[in-house]
Amino acid sequence: MRWARLIERGPVLDVASGSGRHAALLAERGFAVLAVDKGDPVSGPGIEFVKANLEDGSPWPFAGRRFAGIVVTNYLHRPLLPILVESLEEGGVLIYETFMLGNERYGRPSNPHFLLRPGELLEAFSALTIVAFEQGVQERPKKAVVQRICVLRGPAGSVKIDP
């Protein structure tokens, strides 16, 4: 999570947290982290876990809440994209990375419903300030075609970038 350093405060929402690797990393930085997943609970100091299926039509479990950071990796449920935009507080950072079309050459996911179209994250988060965007083949940890974006709710001049 190369851009995690741009998250300067909590609370941070880890969507589809899986084993909790990102939640743990962010909690180690001192942030209050809310991890949500339909699977087994994630635990650790600074981590609150909410068990929820985000795809079954239930209401968004965090209605009215805003987050200083939102992290989503290896997960795509398109109806959540505008909800994530609404859930990001002023000055907040959203980091999203998942597979895109072309990944079927390397393995799963291969169903187009679970693969982003070229530039799709740019479109989905166009109301926010783009800090960084990448799409293409990654070699590690396993070869895959991915798309990743880091966006900010606020002016671009408030982000410190590396030279």
Predicted features and spans:
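A short acidic, Gly/Pro-enriched loop at the edge of an enzyme's catalytic core
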Residues: 59-69
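Short alpha-helix
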Residues: 113-127
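Helix-to-beta-strand junctions that scaffold the AdoMet/dcAdoMet cofactor pocket
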Residues: 88-89
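Core SAM-dependent methyltransferase catalytic element
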Residues: 138-163
